[in-house]
Design a protein with these regions (language model features):
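Noncatalytic luminal/extracellular "stalk/propeptide" segments of secretory-pathway proteins
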Residues: 7-106
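Second-shell loop/turn segments in exported
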Residues: 12-21, 40, 72, 100-111, ...
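Solvent-exposed loop/turn segments at secondary-structure junctions
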Residues: 48-49, 101-103, 128-132, 157-158, ...
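Soluble metallo-hydrolase cores and metallopeptidase-like ectodomains found primarily
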Residues: 60-91, 135-214, 223-230, 234-237
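Metal-dependent peptidase/peptidase-like ectodomains
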Residues: 194-195, 242-342
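His/Asp/Glu-rich mid-to-C-terminal helical/loop segments that flank catalytic regions of hydrolases
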Residues: 226, 237-238, 342-375
Length: 375
């Protein structure tokens, strides 16, 4: 399968929000791909409390703006909440704010703190991206929701809403949904060898189709697994593709609760994060808490054909994505995370959002470094 065929196949599953039909279908597809690569691959069931959104909106000045509830926030009664709009942090009953979806990429982010300290009865947040459509925030506290009801709306509504907030315009907001048992799965693939293993880690779920956000990491994960299975090596390999990324890394939490040594004691955790090979966004963060390893990865990327200038190479600092789960558990990680103008937006689709040449170069470089670490 060529890189182009891989991205097209990935994109064809459509929306892969955790617990949905696309999530289940793409999980079995990826398990089969890992098995075909030469690994022993299985689905590891993950149960969770699933939030099912109902129609939600804000009405003001004769307009109804449809949106999506924040998945780790509260909901309103059927009649909603009526009151004046005002800037987030004001005394207005309904707070208004604009932000980028990446601003809430880690637990305890400033917006989460603002929600905890909020005096608002409800909040509406306009999410800004290149297409300015509805690009939801990740719900880090999906298993323990808190705070006032929050309505997420398209970024294109920000100027209108902020203007109303400055004038204290009256509005009504409805944020609705229910919670039910949900089911998803991690994929766990393994190659035999000596302990401690090399761990390949990538998230596989997202809010929408999210092709550039997720598929580049999965391509690198599969490419490395295929290379490791076909090459002489000494070390065992475990490859995890986890669900629930957008819901506070639920799949990673379940995996490392079941096998804490994987996060803590693996020879290295190679974290293949978001936006690897996204079109129009060459910036790529290469970060490790192992001295010299980020520089080695950067050299491998350049050797594979990735431009050097956009690489941000760092040792230490704050790990993001699932690498944060490794860092917080005392493990050694090497992490790759890129940028994406369509981040969390429904327009992140093949072929428009994918830079095939860079995605392929990243996958080749990851496979080369993985093979070195498993030698």
């Amino acid at each position: 399968m060529t890189s182009e065929e891989f991205f097209a196949a990935y994109d064809a599953f459509g929306e892969r929000r955790t617990g949905g039909e696309g999530d289940a279908a793409s999980a079995e597809w990826l398990r089969a791909r890992a098995q075909a690569a030469g690994a022993a691959a299985m689905l590891m069931p993950v149960t969770f409390g699933r939030f099912l959104p109902d129609p939600s909106w804000l009405e003001a000045k004769g307009r109804r703006i449809e949106g999506l509830p924040l998945f780790d926030g509260g909901t309103t009664e059927e009649a909603g909440i009526s009151g004046a709009l005002g800037p987030l942090g004001s005394d207005a009953p309904i707070g208004v704010v604009e932000m980028e979806p990446r601003a809430a990429s880690l637990p305890g982010n400033p917006f989460a703190v603002a929600r905890q300290q909020s005096r608002h009865a409800a909040i509406v947040v306009a999410l800004r991206t290149q297409p300015d459509s509805l690009a939801p925030l990740n719900a880090h506290d999906a298993e323990s929701p808190f705070g006032p009801p929050v309505l997420q709306v398209a970024g294109r509504e920000a100027p209108f809403l902020l203007g109303l907030a400055e004038r204290g315009t009256a509005a009504r907001i409805v944020v609705a949904g229910s919670r039910a048992p949900g089911r998803s799965a991690n994929i766990r693939a393994s190659l035999t060898g000596e302990a401690p293993p090399l761990l390949l880690l990538t998230p596989r779920s997202s809010w929408w189709t999210s092709t550039a956000e997720r598929a580049g990491g999965i391509l690198a994960w599969l490419t490395a697994l295929e290379t490791l299975a076909a090459s002489p090596r000494r070390r065992a390999v475990v490859a995890l593709a986890t669900c629930g990324h957008e819901l506070g890394h639920i799949g990673a939490h379940r995996a490392f609760t079941a096998e804490p040594a994987l996060a803590r004691d693996s020879r290295l955790v190679l974290h293949l994060g978001a936006n690897l090979g996204c079109a129009g966004a060459e910036h790529l963060v290469v970060r490790s808490n192992v001295e010299g390893l980020a520089e080695r990865m950067a050299a491998a990327l350049v050797a594979a054909g990735h431009p050097r200038a956009p690489l941000e190479v760092a040792t230490g600092g704050k790990a993001n994505g699932e690498a944060h789960e490794i860092e917080s558990r005392g493990g050694s990680y090497l992490s790759l995370i890129g940028d994406n103008p369509w981040f969390h937006a429904p327009e992140d689709r093949w072929p428009d959002s994918v830079d095939i040449a860079r995605a392929t170069a990243i996958a080749r470089a990851v496979a080369a470094v993985a093979l070195e670490q498993a030698a």
